């Protein structure tokens, strides 16, 4: 206790004293049943299966059912991850959901997921970081476990991009699909998650973006004379710009991350890049 003036002591705040290690204890995944071929995509765009495979390496993708939500997909992936981690859902102290396709501004999807899984009153929140969201979630979970805030964190990356894809847009219609991946991060005797390199490029917000803000839909809904003037706020991107950006940036970030971990590329057993498309990965 530190006195500030006679008769008025101020209590000292306490916090966890030891920095622990963390690792991924279990992984889970979910892909919807419906397989969508390039031929089906080409019904709406001027393209071909051969062109799509040549440009992206993509042969098929999965689309969720119309009544299948991001929480439904996240639940399936999470149950698998929790089972593989060998823990009870009640041991999970926090749920992090990475998604940009939960259709509600509020409430977040994470609390509903925690409730479905039988997790009693966890800290639960969504993060909106698009392609980087899952990695952001893993890093946050790692920090939470190491700091002693919680012992186990459920991290889920899930998207239902079929709801926000313009099937008539030749530049993006064949790129996106639906699915979920989950991980349980928990306490470990040895380090299991390496350093994270954070960053963003705010000057490139127009490269991959939502076509219209949600607020632009209100005039069209309230005034019939505006019908047809406002497009559904689907995701669009500048393909060539994204390709160049991803190829050069991802390679440098990988090099910098390896250096931050104080290892070399020869020490790596596997390299798992973001699954954008085969051309980017190969480049």
Describe the predicted segments one by one.
Residues 77-93, 252-269:
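Phosphate/pyrophosphate-binding loops at sites that engage ATP/ADP/AMP, CoA/4′-phosphopantetheine
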Residues 30, 98-103, 129-134, 157-162, ...:
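Acidic, glycine-rich active-site loops and adjacent beta-strand->loop/helix elements
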Residues 24-26, 52, 81, 92-95, ...:
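Buried hydrophobic positions in well-ordered alpha/beta secondary-structure cores of metabolic enzymes
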Residues 2-66, 169-248, 252:
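Condensing-enzyme catalytic core mediating Claisen C-C bond formation in acyl metabolism
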Residues 21-24, 94-96, 151-155:
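Short glycine-aspartate micro-motif
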Residues 95-104, 268-283:
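Glycine-rich phosphate-binding loops at beta-strand->alpha-helix junctions
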């Amino acid at each position: 206790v530190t006195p500030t003036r006679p008769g008025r002591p101020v209590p000292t705040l306490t916090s966890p004293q030891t920095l622990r290690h963390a690792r991924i204890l279990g992984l889970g995944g979910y892909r919807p049943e419906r397989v969508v071929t390039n031929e089906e995509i080409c019904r709406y765009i001027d393209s071909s299966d051969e062109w799509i495979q040549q440009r992206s390496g993509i042969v098929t993708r999965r689309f969720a059912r119309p009544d299948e939500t991001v929480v439904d997909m996240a639940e399936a992936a999470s149950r698998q991850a929790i089972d593989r981690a060998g823990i009870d859902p009640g041991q999970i102290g926090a749920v992090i959901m990475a998604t940009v396709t939960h259709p509600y501004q509020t409430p977040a999807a994470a609390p509903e997921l925690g409730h479905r899984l039988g997790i009693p009153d966890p800290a639960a929140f969504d993060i909106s970081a698009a392609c980087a969201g899952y990695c952001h979630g893993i890093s946050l979970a790692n920090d939470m476990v190491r700091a002693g805030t919680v012992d186990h964190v459920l991290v889920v990356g899930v998207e239902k991009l079929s709801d926000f894809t313009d099937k008539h847009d030749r530049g993006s219609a064949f790129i996106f699909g639906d699915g979920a991946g989950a991980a349980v991060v928990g306490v470990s005797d040895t380090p299991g998650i390496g350093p994270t390199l954070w960053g963003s490029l705010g000057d490139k917000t127009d490269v991959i973006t939502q076509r219209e803000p949600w607020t632009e839909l209100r005039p069209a809904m309230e005034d019939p004379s505006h019908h047809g003037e406002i497009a559904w706020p689907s995701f669009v991107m500048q393909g060539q710009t994204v390709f160049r950006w991803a190829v050069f940036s991802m390679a440098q970030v990988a090099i910098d991350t390896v250096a931050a971990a104080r290892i070399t590329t020869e020490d790596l057993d596997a390299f798992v890049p973001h699954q954008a498309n085969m051309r980017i990965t190969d480049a």
